[in-house]
Design a protein with these regions (language model features):
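Structured domain cores in non-transmembrane regions
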Residues: 24-94
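Beta-strand signatures of extracellular beta-sandwich domains
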Residues: 18-22
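Short coil-to-beta strand junction motifs in C2/discoidin
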Residues: 11-17, 96-98
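Short amphipathic, basic-aromatic surface patches that mediate peripheral association
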Residues: 1-12, 35-39
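Beta-strand elements of well-folded, non-transmembrane domains
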Residues: 4-6, 23, 88-90, 105-109
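Glycine-rich, aromatic-bearing surface loops/beta-hairpins
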Residues: 82, 92-146
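Generic domain-boundary/flexible-linker signal
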Residues: 11, 30, 43, 112-114
Length: 146
């Protein structure tokens, strides 16, 4: 679950959001989602992807956008439930250890924020791991199932 807060600003733009899976030492395992203006003419929405700096440096610059099953449209303020059907195959290949889901948001004429949600793999039971952003992101809850 991902909460995008409504900000009281003169010029509001929906944030671009990227979520990915990484090891405890911050090596990218795979991308979960990239939400941006996918329908802008001449792929103009891709211009701002680099504003999600951590994601861009670690993974984004090497991707040919849009990525099937990963790319999607920006979301309005509110709470959203995102599912990652490809994550199961990704997780099944991982050795036991500490991992984290990383969520980064950036807005045109706005700020940027990154939230890390740590978890142990493999799971012994279903888990719901909460985290909270301060400005660009609200509550982030990662629900994991074995």
């Amino acid at each position: 679950k991902l909460e995008i807060p409504q900000l009281n600003v003169a010029e509001y733009h929906r944030p671009y959001v990227a979520a990915w899976l990484e090891t405890a030492d911050q090596k990218v395992v795979g991308n979960l989602t990239v939400l941006y203006d996918v329908k802008k003419k001449d792929k103009a929405g891709e211009k701002w992807l680099k504003d999600m700096r951590q994601w861009w440096r670690k993974s984004g610059r090497d991707l040919a956008m849009p990525v099937d099953g990963v790319s999607g449209a920006t979301r309005a303020p509110g709470e959203h439930t995102l599912t990652f059907p490809g994550a199961k195959a990704l997780l099944d290949k991982l050795p036991a250890g500490e991992y984290q889901v990383v969520v980064e948001a950036a807005r045109e004429a706005g700020g940027r924020e990154l939230v890390r949600v740590p978890f142990q793999w493999p799971l012994k039971s279903a888990q719901s791991v909460p985290a909270k952003g301060k400005e660009e992101l609200g509550n982030v809850v990662v629900q994991l199932k074995p």
